[in-house]
Amino acid sequence: MLVNADLHTHSCFSAATSKDMVINNIAPKSREKGLNLVGTGDALHPKWLDIVAESTEYKGDGIYSHKDCDFILTTEVEAQHKIHHVIIIPDIDVARELSQKLVSPNKFIDGRPRSPLSGAELFELVKEYDCMIGPAHSFTPWTGMYKTYDSIYDCYEKKPDFVELGLSADTNMADTVKELSDFVFLTNPDAHSPWPHRLGREFNQIEMGDISYTSLQKALKH
């Protein structure tokens, strides 16, 4: 099945984000935009996880279902050198445990936690929990991975699961970087409000066996 997925959003708990970014607003607007699967964003924030759990029904295998669309747990972490990383998380129990494990001075305040960990250290931490990880908006000159590193392997030391392009780049641009030739590209809007001109401005069409964490994980390996 072909799934329309927006995998990078934020909640009402992130700085400079609309108070309207709650599940019961995001879900109907996602349906209006034609999205089947949406990242929750901010999945390391305990209060946001409570709202996700209260506003959805857990279908199993990482999917939290609302009548208008399905959700999967995602978060953005600002790590060493102010580089942003997107993390996709298997379920709420893992998210709560990872939140406790992550070294961050603001993880209970801001939906986008800051951490002193390097990209490689963050990679190793999230892989302990079978999460997926990749650089957020990789070419953005302020918080993108390539603003600091000449190579993605200098950042992570190992191959991450994907490269997010975001609004600052496209596939044609990223294809000029030889080391990215065997990477999966994702493109997401990094939405800070649920309105149709923000949510799903860019999204991914992913061939999946079904809507589940396992199917997404398999799809991103191809």
What annotation goes with each model-predicted range?
Residues 1-37, 46-106, 110, 124-129, ...:
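Charged catalytic cores and adjacent phosphate/nucleic-acid-binding surfaces used
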Residues 43, 136-140:
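Short, well-ordered beta-to-alpha junction loops that form the rim of enzyme active sites
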Residues 112-116:
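Active-site glycine- and acidic-residue-rich loops that bind
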Residues 119-122:
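Phosphate-interacting basic helix/loop segments used at nucleotide- and nucleic-acid interfaces
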Residues 134-136, 188:
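Short, conserved beta-strand edge motifs with alternating hydrophobic and charged residues
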